[in-house]
């Protein structure tokens, strides 16, 4: 994905305000051996790009005054209640150095899993993204989580996920194999099934004497 930007000379709160009035978003690109560069981006183009999932987890081609560098979107700020992007930070990447980034998890085959198809269960997503490390060329837009074999009372853990080649998960909090998704039967459904079973047992018990008289 390509991002067009321009180097900006004026800095400070007043300059940033004037840029936003002019339809531009101030930003910065940093990292690597080059000095940080303050930039301006077209606000509307950036606003719509930020709505795309891939924009947050892909290597971007950032063109600043005709010079193209590969970067990652590292941070952005938006207005509390206006549809306004206030600032964006981009980090340069080196093709030979591994990067550390969060990528979204895509859950597939929930409808055909035993938990849902056979038991009418609910699958809860414990995590929605995954911290990974890899070379820029190996960066996936997302990591797929296959729920096809998930049954009620069981979980999907990190070890159950097949990571793309060259990609390693970054573990936090000392947990070696964190839970990614769980499957359970809704409480109301469990109670309804228990009531139905009790009613069936009562009916069978009531019918038993009549059957014995035959």
UniProtKB/Swiss-Prot annotation:
GO terms for molecular function: 5S rRNA binding; structural constituent of ribosome. GO terms for cellular component: cytosolic large ribosomal subunit. It comes from the Bacteria. GO terms for biological process: translation. Belongs to the bacterial ribosomal protein bL25 family. CTC subfamily. HAMAP family: Ribosomal_bL25, Ribosomal_bL25_CTC. This is Large ribosomal subunit protein bL25.
